[in-house]
């Protein structure tokens, strides 16, 4: 479970990599592959595997979802700059969430334009499938989650003109 602004959300999956700052995990929804998520460890409030989860875990393993831990894109997660350098050549859309702002939670889906020391420059595609004219400078300190490989972003990537 993750918590910010007194809101808790859960990610179900197999952990892949852990650093002092971040955790990379597979994401599984209803026994279906939903890509990968990288979240800040400071937002993680609970990690658990209940006895009742063992049956669900066996289903996921039988469906081959545990094999997703061998993904090739992100191997080191010590800093956001390091993570974005590894995702720079990812053949798909990346989603960035900035959830800690009380007045506005920002969601970006698109491609990395440039990687700076404290920000990532990001080209965003709207929900209408049209590229935003503006390139967004997203400060690392605002980023709460990075995800990729999920069906939502894969469908947009497939149908949005490059």
Regions picked out by a protein language model, each given a short descriptive name:
Residues 1-10, 22-24, 28-104, 126-162:
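Short glycine-rich, low-complexity segments
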Residues 9-17, 107-113:
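Short beta-strand-centered aromatic/proline hotspots
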Residues 16-20, 114-118, 142:
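Preference for intrinsically disordered or flexible, low-complexity segments
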Residues 109-125, 129-130, 134:
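Extended, basic/helix-rich recognition subdomains
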């Amino acid at each position: 479970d993750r918590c910010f602004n007194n809101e808790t959300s859960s990610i179900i999956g197999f952990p892949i990599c852990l650093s002092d700052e971040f955790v990379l995990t597979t994401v599984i929804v209803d026994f279906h592959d939903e890509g990968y998520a990288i979240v800040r460890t400071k937002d993680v409030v609970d990690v658990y595997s209940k006895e009742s989860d063992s049956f669900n875990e066996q289903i996921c393993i039988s469906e081959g979802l545990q094999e997703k831990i061998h993904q090739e894109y992100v191997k080191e997660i010590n800093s956001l700059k390091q993570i974005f350098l590894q995702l720079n050549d990812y053949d798909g859309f990346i989603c960035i969430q900035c959830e800690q702002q009380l007045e506005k939670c920002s969601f970006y889906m698109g491609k990395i334009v440039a990687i700076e020391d404290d920000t990532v420059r990001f080209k965003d595609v709207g929900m209408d499938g049209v590229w935003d004219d503006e390139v967004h400078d997203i400060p690392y300190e605002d980023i709460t989650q990075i995800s990729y490989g999920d069906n939502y972003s894969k469908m947009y990537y497939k149908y949005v003109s490059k």
